[in-house]
């Protein structure tokens, strides 16, 4: 039986909650521009497709810097590291709010991306580490709930605030909330010396694990497919579905709420049906993307599709995150830095592909292109599942990594 010091055990769920709140802030700021593309574009006399490239730049900076930043900070005590990360985060948001040009806005987003690169390299492993014994899957689920709430509350409220008071106010609001989160992290987290972070010597070892490499490839394909459509959901709903700004905000709320439902589904079924859950999630996502245009004419039908879509992408992300942690218990931070980097390659690639599709084929076709790409991911998933055989339950693998 694994035991912890009384004070650490008592505060373990509070620590996980604090990390989930931090995840809420980081995911809110990464994706809030999706709901503000038109407003930001008007400020700098740019089209939504042009402004959308800030999503690509942000994501690709994260992807390039996740591993180098993790290695550079691998010996720093984790609570102190999070304080530095949030300091950079807050300062960069203030710069975003006062940016006089799109170029300065991009510079500020790069600063946020550096903070993001470090945060997501260590957070999942920290949540698992401080969770009560036997509650690692639930800890990941709570972390995912913070991510989902960014979709439910952060992005829609950011859009509402941006439309009412300007998009700059949205970034100032995020900075203020982040400053409060810092105090909660200081109170909630125990001292967390760096542990099993790995080093450059870990890379050749990880690259020799074919199941892990397959997970990384699958991540890149499916995340690119998802963000090809999701990055341009605002102009899609307004120009193709002809929804009002208020209905678009509601649709974003629905998507985020579905993500919470997806995290619950993950917690319930990931141990018993790891392969089935992953294949079902990718298959459902593929179908939703392919049906986005055909079902875009009716608001209720589109809302239903959005719910299913949101559940599917959340189940997909959580399942792969859990597998990365279980397949690399000897180098969790390196493995998660690679996962975060590849995930963000997918985000940036999807935003870029969506921009190209919007400019040359029309924004109406982003779902079709994304769906075809997701179909390739489904084929890869089925092949690797057959090739590698049955996956052991997540709880069993996490217990072995202790």
UniProtKB/Swiss-Prot annotation:
It holds the Pfam family MFS_1. It is found in: Cell inner membrane. Keywords: Cell inner membrane, Cell membrane, Membrane, Sugar transport, Transmembrane, Transmembrane helix, Transport. It is a multi-pass membrane protein. The chain crosses the membrane at residues 14-34, 51-71, 84-104, 110-130, 137-157, 171-191, 213-233, 249-269, 276-296, 300-320, 334-354, 361-381. GO terms for cellular component: plasma membrane. InterPro entries: MFS, MFS_dom, MFS_Efflux_Transporters, MFS_trans_sf, Sugar_effux_transptr_put. One of its GO terms (molecular function) is carbohydrate transmembrane transporter activity. It comes from the Bacteria. Belongs to the major facilitator superfamily. SotB (TC 2.A.1.2) family. Involved in the efflux of sugars. The physiological role may be the reduction of the intracellular concentration of toxic sugars or sugar metabolites. This is Probable sugar efflux transporter. It comes from Pseudomonas syringae pv. syringae (strain B728a). The lineage of its organism: Bacteria, Pseudomonadati, Pseudomonadota, Gammaproteobacteria, Pseudomonadales. The gene is sotB.
């Amino acid at each position: 039986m694994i035991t912890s010091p009384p004070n650490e055990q008592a505060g373990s769920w509070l620590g996980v909650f604090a990390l989930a709140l931090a995840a809420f802030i980081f995911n809110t700021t990464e994706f809030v521009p999706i709901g503000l593309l038109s407003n930001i574009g008007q400020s700098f006399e740019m089209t939504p497709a042009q402004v959308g490239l800030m999503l690509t730049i942000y994501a690709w900076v994260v992807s390039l810097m996740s591993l180098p930043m993790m290695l550079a900070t691998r010996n720093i005590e984790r609570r102190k590291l999070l304080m530095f990360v949030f300091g950079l985060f807050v300062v960069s948001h203030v710069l975003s709010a006062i940016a006089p040009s799109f170029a300065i806005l991009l510079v500020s987003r790069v600063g946020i991306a550096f903070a993001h690169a470090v945060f997501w390299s260590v957070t999942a492993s920290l949540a698992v580490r401080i969770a009560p014994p036997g509650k690692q899957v639930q800890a990941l689920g709570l972390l995912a709930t913070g991510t989902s709430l960014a979709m439910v509350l952060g992005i829609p409220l950011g859009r509402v605030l941006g439309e009412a008071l300007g998009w700059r106010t949205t970034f100032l609001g995020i900075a203020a909330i982040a400053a409060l989160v810092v105090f909660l992290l200081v109170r909630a987290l125990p001292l967390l010396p760096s542990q099993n972070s790995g080093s450059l010597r870990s890379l050749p070892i990880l690259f020799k694990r074919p199941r892990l490499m397959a997970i990384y490839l699958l991540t890149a394909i499916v995340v690119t497919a998802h963000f090809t459509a999701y990055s341009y959901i605002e102009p899609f709903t307004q120009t193709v579905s002809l929804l009002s700004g208020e209905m678009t905000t509601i649709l974003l709320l629905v998507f985020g709420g579905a993500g919470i439902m997806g995290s619950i589904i993950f917690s319930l079924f990931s141990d018993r049906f790891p392969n089935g859950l992953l294949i079902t999630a990718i298959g459902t996502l593929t179908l939703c993307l392919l049906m986005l245009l055909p079902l875009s004419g009716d608001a209720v039908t589109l809302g239903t599709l959005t719910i299913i879509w949101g559940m599917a992408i959340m189940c997909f992300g959580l399942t792969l995150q859990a597998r990365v942690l279980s397949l690399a218990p000897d180098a969790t931070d390196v493995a998660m830095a690679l996962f975060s980097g590849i995930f963000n390659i997918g985000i940036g690639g999807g935003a870029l592909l969506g921009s190209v599709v919007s400019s040359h084929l029309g924004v109406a076709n982003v779902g079709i292109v994304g769906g075809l790409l997701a179909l390739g991911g489904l084929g890869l998933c089925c092949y690797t599942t057959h090739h590698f055989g049955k996956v052991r339950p997540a709880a069993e693998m996490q217990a072995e990594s202790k």
